[in-house]
Amino acid sequence: LDKKLRTEMQLEVVEIIEQVGVTCIMVTHDQEEAMTMADRVAIMADGWIEQVGSPVDIYESPASRMVAEFVGTVNLFEGEIIEDAADHCRIESPALSRPIYIDHGITTQAVDRRGWAALRPEKIWLPREQPSSEYNWEAGKVDDIAYLGGYSLYYVRTASGQMIKVSMANTERRGDRPTWEDSVYVYWENH
């Protein structure tokens, strides 16, 4: 089936399952299919369940680095937890010149303070002006752009060599958008 027909069929199958009132288990490697059809998703690796939850929970709050990398596209930053409170944490990453600030705490007692911060490309903005915040941004240059119709995927290289993927909706036919070799800032919110 072509993509358009496959998507329509997925929605029809979900409607039939709901009308009949049965529980179905479906095994797929197609992430879009799983996110479209399921109200609960289980992510497995090496025969073990890594995480079970709604598609929104799996995508927005992955329980592990493996789940974050497996579902969708993600930018990962390894770093050290330098502050951990009930309402926030800060992570310093050698890939970034500024700390990452997250508006909820991890509250771990682990001795190893190393961790990963995962940022989805669509959660990142690409301003040309330097953000005023002391956290959650980095300067870089547009290294490459993939135009994908409804959105463009920007690859921004930072001074440390880190490549950060940023997704921008193509809401205007033509606009004043960054292009190759432009100096830009990548910026994201606290959560």
Predicted feature residues:
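Residues located in well-ordered beta-strands
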Residues: 54, 66, 78-80, 139-141
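Non-catalytic connector elements of ABC transporters
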Residues: 74, 84-191
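ABC ATPase nucleotide-binding domains
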Residues: 1-69
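Short acidic/glycine-rich beta-turn/loop cap or linker motifs at sensory/regulatory domain boundaries
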Residues: 46, 82-83
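Short glycine- and Lys/Arg-enriched binding-loop motifs that mark or flank ligand-binding interfaces
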Residues: 17, 30, 43, 68, ...
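Elongated periplasmic alpha-helical coiled-coil
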Residues: 70-73, 80
